[in-house]
Amino acid sequence: MRYFIGIASKNHIQIGQAGGFCQLCHGKAAPLKRMKQNDKIIYYSPKLTMESKEPYQAFTALGEIADENVYQVEMFKGFFPFRRNVLWSEIKRECPLNVAKTHPEWKAYASKLRFGHFEVSKEFFNFLAEYMTQDS
């Protein structure tokens, strides 16, 4: 099992949660193919919406890759992103970026937030997931 961070605006993540899927890197297939069934993903939202200039900076969703299928859909006319099915977990609270910064491995991952998708250690992933699933 591997552990990943995906990056997207919160409103885009909510669309995926409602539909039971994830998209990465503006619909590219390659990052989705790096993940396998039962791998875990946490999404980081730098902004509430893609158009917004105001920072949001929180880890906002937690899930598990449901199967081995990478598939393409027409989201709207002329846009055919690739997706993966995800079993989304219920979270009790989002994890602010400032909390993630307290983890000893943070410096190794900080610069990767601009890449859209990257693998993290089980320890770092569990640190975020535990924060997100515990009562405040």
UniProtKB/Swiss-Prot annotation:
It holds the Pfam family EVE. It comes from the Bacteria. InterPro entries: EVE_domain, PUA-like_sf, UPF0310. NCBIfam families: PRK02268.1-2, PRK02268.1-3. Belongs to the UPF0310 family. This is UPF0310 protein HH_1062. It comes from Helicobacter hepaticus (strain ATCC 51449 / 3B1). The lineage of its organism: Bacteria, Pseudomonadati, Campylobacterota, Epsilonproteobacteria, Campylobacterales.
